[in-house]
Amino acid sequence: MPDIKTAEVDIKIIESRGETDMKDRQISKAVIKRLPRYRRYLKELEKKGVEKISSKDLSVLIGYTASQIRQDLNNFGGFGQQGYGYSVTNLHEQIGSILGLDKTYKMVIVGYGRLGQAMASYISNNEPNFHIVGIFDVKQIIQDVQFKDAQIMTCGSLRDFVEKENVDIAVITVPSAKAQLVADTVVDAGIKGIWNLTAVDLDLPENIAVENVHMSDSLHALVYYMGDTDTE
C-alpha cells in the first residue's frame, strides 16, 4: 500500500447541516471529526488510481484500528461489502455528502491581517465548495481593493453585506478583543457557521455551529509530546 503524506488541515467540518436523521442518531463529535481525515486519505488513494481498499489497509494508512473505521462508517450505513472492502471513489463521495460537501457555501473572512490573507489564499486554492464573497477588516481599507472576486471592505458594512448576500460561514481572524463583537454581528445577520481562528472561545447561541481553531493549544500539546518522548 502506498505511503501517503499530506499537510492538509482537517478543517472541513460542518456540524449543523439540518439533517434530522443524523441528529436523531446523536452521532458523536469524535466520529464527525474523524470523517475529514478518512476523506482526505481516500482522495489521495483516488489520485493514485486505487479502486478499492479494505478497512485493514485503510487502518494502516490512517492510524485508526480497522474496527474503529468500520464502527464509524456503520453510523451512516456502512458502505463496504464483505470480501470486497470499500470502493474508494464511492466512499470518498459518500463521506463528502455526509459532511455537507456536496453543496457550496458562501463565506466571508473577517480580519485581513497576515492570518486572514493566508486563509483567503488557502481556501480559494484548496476548497472549491467554499466561495469567499467578501473580506472585512477593522482597519480602513483603500476603496476598490479586491481579492479575486471578493471585495475587501471595512467592518462597518459587515452586517448588511452578510444579510444581503445570505452568507453561510464567517471566518474570524480579528484580534481577540474584537472577536465576540464580530461573532455577534454576523450571527445577528443570519450566519449559521463560524470558523473561529482567534485565541478566545465565543459565547454563541446553541443553533450556531462553531469550530474553534486555537493554534497555541496545538503547539503547546506538541511541546508536551516532545518531552514525553524524551523520557521514554
Q: What residue ranges belong to the model's regions?
A:
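NAD(P)-binding Rossmann-fold cofactor-contacting core
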Residues: 126-148
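Glycine-rich Rossmann-fold phosphate-binding loop(s) that bind the pyrophosphate
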Residues: 112
